[in-house]
Structures are given as C-alpha cells and as structure tokens.
C-alpha cells in the first residue's frame, strides 16, 4: 500500500482503490489517452471530499474529479488521485420548478437527470451520444 493510501485510510470513509488492476480500469476513458492514476477514492460524503483535498494538498498530489469516464478528449485520466463521484455522489439534491433550477451531485448520469425532469416539461439541453453514461 502506498503512503498516500495509508494516510487516506485514516481520514476518509469512502471506498479506496490502490491496486494495479483497479487503477488500470481508471487509466482510460473514451479517448486514446492512457494515464495510470495514483489511486481512486469513491467519496461517501462531503467530508470525504474535503479530507481528500486536504491530503492531496499536504502530499503535493493532483486531484481529478471523475464520473462516467466518457470524455473523448482525455479530461478524466491523469496521474492523480481520482475522485469517482459516480458511485455515491449522484442524484438530484434540489428541484425548484418555480425558478427552473436544479441542483445535482456531480455523479448524476445525464439520462437520469432528464428522466426526472421530463414529467415537468423540462430537460437539460446537452445532447451527447454518451448521455446514458455521461455525468
């Protein structure tokens, strides 16, 4: 286990993945780029995210926020600590129909958001081919 993993295990409740196989799964997205991350944290709370940011700052490590990994330009791969928001940090926090405002967590899938908005005659107007996976 790496030093970074040891520190994070004492500071977060989320799932940590530092084995080579798991890191390899996060080394690619829909682009041609391949970059092995240092490790992966699936945060379970805002406290996990804050702690991960603190540890990254203390250790001089970059952070990479990731959801569905559907980028075709390589934005979701890097030699960094990956925060995978797709597992626990998804969903709608607030839907304010009067003001046509929606607050979501970063891991929500675009199609799921639009399914929730459709009964209200609304949709989030981003039309991508990966909407069933894109966050």
Description of each model-found segment:
Residues 74-79, 114-116:
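Short acidic, glycine/serine/threonine-rich loops at helix termini
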Residues 22, 72-73, 131-135:
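A glycine-rich phosphate-binding loop feature that marks nucleotide/adenosyl-phosphate handling sites
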Residues 8, 31-63, 85-130:
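N-terminal glycine-rich flavin-associated loop
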Residues 66:
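Conserved PLP cofactor-binding pocket of PLP-dependent enzymes
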Residues 1-5:
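Intrinsic disorder at enzyme termini
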Residues 82:
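Short glycine-aspartate micro-motif
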Residues 6-27:
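Conserved oxyanion/phosphate-binding beta-strand-loop segments in alpha/beta enzyme cores
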């Amino acid at each position: 286990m790496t030093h970074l993993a040891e520190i994070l295990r004492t500071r977060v409740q989320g799932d940590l993945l530092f084995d080579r196989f798991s890191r390899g799964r996060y080394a690619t997205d829909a682009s041609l780029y391949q970059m092995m991350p240092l490790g992966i944290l699936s945060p379970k709370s805002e406290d996990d995210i804050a702690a991960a940011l603190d540890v990254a700052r203390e250790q001089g490590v970059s952070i990479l926020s990731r959801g569905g990994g559907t980028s075709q330009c390589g934005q979701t791969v890097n030699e960094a600590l990956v925060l995978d928001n797709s597992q626990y940090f998804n969903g709608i926090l607030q839907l304010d129909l009067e003001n046509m405002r929606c607050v979501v967590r970063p891991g929500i899938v675009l199609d799921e958001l639009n399914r929730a908005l459709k009964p209200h005659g609304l949709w989030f107007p981003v039309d991508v081919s990966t909407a069933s996976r894109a966050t």
